[in-house]
């Protein structure tokens, strides 16, 4: 069954400015600018109201799969708005049973060097995605903090660090060493 018209709106806060170029959404906020291209999805994007403070996503004659993309786009835009206002912060913790994992940040937080993982001499180097800064926590031992505006780049950088410390040729139920995401949040606290 095809639905004639289905739509959803996203409310835009006061301090955020959104511009549309075709199906490319550009979000400007206090922390910076994010852009995302939705050209591969056949939907209509439009700004509503005198102050352009709502973004509407329309889909005409969509089946079930196509209608699901409406909410997906709205979620992506909401994440972009959250990113340019609050920013995203992921915290990662080093876990080790015997050999302490030594993490060094190089090149102003864009390169992570992992040494002494399971006592190995090999140095693992993980480059952060552009726009993601990594730092070692001062308050907590063995903790890394990743910060950025784009949730996909921040979470992808965290995944690259976690995958760099995979244990090979051992029983992973016993060898739990690695660097894992411990907390996901925002850089600034939301005013409730």
Swiss-Prot record:
Entries under SUPFAM superfamilies matching the protein: Ribosomal protein L6 (SSF56053)
InterPro entries tied to this protein: Ribosomal_uL6-like, Ribosomal_uL6-like_a/b-dom_sf, Ribosomal_uL6_a/b-dom, Ribosomal_uL6_CS2
Residues recorded with modification N6-acetyllysine: 121
Record's keyword annotation contains Cytoplasm: yes
Transmembrane domains' residue ranges: none
Location of this chain's protein in the cell: Cytoplasm
GO terms, molecular function: rRNA binding; structural constituent of ribosome
GO terms under biological process: cytoplasmic translation
GO CC list: cytosolic large ribosomal subunit
Oligomeric and partner information: Component of the large ribosomal subunit.
Family: Belongs to the universal ribosomal protein uL6 family.
Protein name: Large ribosomal subunit protein uL6
Organism: Macaca fascicularis
